[in-house]
Regions:
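Transmembrane-lumen/periplasm boundary regions of multi-pass, lipid-linked membrane glycan transferases
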Residues: 56-59, 64-69, 94-97, 215, ...
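Transmembrane-helix signature of polytopic, membrane-embedded enzymes
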Residues: 25-32, 116, 137-159, 177-178, ...
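Transmembrane-helix motifs of polytopic, lipid-linked glycan transferases
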Residues: 121-144, 182, 186, 340-343
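Short acidic/glycine- and proline-prone juxtamembrane loop motifs at membrane-interface regions
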Residues: 50-51, 162-175
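Membrane-interface transmembrane helices that cradle and orient dolichyl/undecaprenyl
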Residues: 13, 142-145, 183-205
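Short periplasmic/luminal acceptor-recognition loop of GT-C membrane glycosyltransferases, typified by
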Residues: 439, 476-523
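Membrane-proximal lumenal/periplasmic loop motifs of glycosylation machinery
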Residues: 45-51, 69-103, 123, 291-307, ...
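Short helix- or helix-capping micro-motifs
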Residues: 153-158, 185, 213, 217
Length: 524
């Protein structure tokens, strides 16, 4: 056993995970899931059609028509090359997305969305995935830390307005985040079952991990970036304990991903390599203008000139000003505590001249949360990496930040409250719940425009200041208002149809035109 493996040993099961749970404790994850589903179903009604949703809905309708042909005319007609390309409009120059968002949206549309109308009916799939994620987050943290920490994890998850509002939309990045969380959960369960189970039951969680990883891989290429992180974590925490999960990652995951992409069935390797070539050699795709600190980056402002990349510090800066401060504090506490614990374990091993020394229970688990949270922000910070749309591209980091916040809370709870004063623990937990709900309620439905008190909130963050003449307007805000157009809902649309005398109306015509074409009722 290596030094790192000793330091990262998860130790015995948590004392907060009793072998016998009450009925309420058993159904608590389900109650959390249902509560999150109801809350999201209420909140989503206030969000208008956003920039990318018309395209996703159009692609969903193409799939519906393709399945109609499959059942009406049989496989020979549906799998004809031209018809397959029309029905599965993905991984191409005009639509670089992968099909998961449309498949999830379609499932929601034909189940819970059956009782709703577009565009909200297509959002139900994402709402269900969000609710399931909340239930898994609660269950996982409760089993490994404590019930109060589990509640704090869910409060942190729904208490980040940008995360919450983004997850309500028919959008890809929340699916990337949720399936990364679910796959990490299955990965951890696989590690535990390797110690506790024997025979065929040892394969349950590795297979589940492979399925979740494969499905998540068809959300977006950013999902793939967590795979090296899993490999590093597995090597550092004992590779012999993860051979089953590694096997399923190499076999089950590719098959699950391929199942969701019929155009690649006839030539899986060629289809995948062609998609990679498209991503790497697209001359236009990454020249997306970025507004950061009052200036425009990453855009070809003058034809033929090389776009200026977004500075690396956009990631830590935007993260620090778009996350509620109490979550930032708890995350810092957890990262600092985990780092010091790892350092102490290494020093103890060195002092013991190679003798095994027990690490802090949970080191491997917290390391998994930390590496999963760090991988995408670190990639986006690399020179030349696309960094458009604020924090959207590394949204999964904020999901794992909820776990880290729970870990930070648990450290403080054990240090200052302990297990003998549960009432005080629940008072502290309830206070954070109120804070999380209040933060979202006060800014709803403008969650995607949230800025915290470190920059004076939304008002100060978007206050025009003198910035010189690098752009036509010398006075402009340092930070941008939402670019999603989610606030242009039906109510605002009616207001726009009857503007006040002398008022000027500015809107994004493509979104309205596509909405009208699909009968989504977004324009006045």
């Amino acid at each position: 056993m290596t030094a790192v493996d000793d330091a990262a040993n998860p130790g015995p099961p948590s004392q907060h995970s009793p072998l016998r749970r009450t009925r309420l404790q058993q159904i608590a994850p389900l109650l959390i899931t249902l509560a999150c589903l109801l809350a999201s179903a209420w909140a989503v009604r206030d969000l208008g059609l956003t920039t990318d949703e018309p395209r996703y809905i159009d692609n969903s309708q193409r799939i519906h028509a393709w399945f109609g042909d499959l059942f009406a005319h049989g496989p020979s007609a549906a799998f004809e090359e031209k018809r397959l390309a029309e029905g599965w409009y993905y991984a191409r120059q005009e639509s670089k997305n992968l099909p998961l968002v449309s498949l999830i949206g379609s499932l929601g549309h034909f189940t819970l969305g059956f009782f709703d109308s577009p565009p909200h009916s297509y959002r139900w799939g994402n709402l269900v995935i969000l609710a399931v994620t909340c239930g898994v987050v609660f269950s996982w943290v409760r089993d490994e830390l404590s019930s109060p920490a589990a509640v704090v994890a869910v409060a942190a998850l729904i208490g980040m307005p940008r995360l919450w509002a983004h997850a309500l939309l028919m959008s890809i990045d929340p699916l990337v985040a949720s399936f990364q969380v679910l796959a990490c959960w299955a990965l951890w369960k696989s590690r535990q079952d390797d110690q506790l189970q024997t025979g065929f039951s040892n394969w349950r969680w590795p297979v589940a991990f492979g399925l979740l990883a494969g499905v998540g891989a068809m959300a977006k290429p950013t999902f793939w970036l967590i795979v090296p992180a899993w490999v590093v974590w597995g090597v550092l925490t004992g590779p012999r304990r993860h051979w089953r999960t590694a096997t399923c990652l190499l076999t089950v995951a590719p098959l699950a991903a391929l199942l969701l992409m019929p155009p690649w069935w006839s030539n899986p390797i060629g289809g995948f390599l062609g998609y990679i070539d498209l991503l790497l050699n697209d001359p236009v795709g990454w020249k997306i203008d970025v507004y950061y600190l009052g200036h425009v980056f990453q855009a070809e402002l003058v034809p033929g000139t090389r776009p200026v990349p977004v500075p690396w510090h956009s990631v830590p800066l935007l993260t620090s000003i778009t996350t509620p401060p109490w979550i930032l504090v708890l995350v810092v506490m957890e990262v600092a505590g985990w780092s010091l614990s790892l350092l102490a374990a290494r020093l103890a091993r060195r002092a013991g001249r190679g003798r095994a020394t027990p690490g802090r229970p949970g080191m491997a688990l917290e390391g998994l949360w930390l590496i999963a949270a760090a991988v995408l922000p670190l990639v986006v910070m690399l020179p030349g990496t696309p960094a458009h749309d604020g924090t959207r591209l590394y949204r999964p980091a904020f999901y794992f930040a909820a776990f880290l916040a729970a870990g930070g809370f648990e450290r403080l709870r054990l240090r200052w409250i302990g297990d003998n004063r549960p009432r005080i623990s629940w008072i502290a937990t309830s206070s954070l719940i109120v804070l999380a709900v209040g933060t979202n309620a006060t800014i709803h439905p403008a969650g995607l425009s949230y800025y915290n008190s470190l920059v004076g909130g939304f008002t100060e963050a978007t206050q025009p200041v003198a910035l010189g003449h690098s752009l036509p307007e010398p006075r402009r805000p340092l930070h941008e208002v939402s670019y999603w157009w989610e606030l242009f809902n039906r109510e605002r649309s009616r207001d726009a149809g009857a503007p006040s005398t002398g008022a000027r109306l500015t809107f994004f015509p493509r979104t309205l035109r596509e909405a009208d074409a699909q009968g989504l009722g977004a324009s006045p």
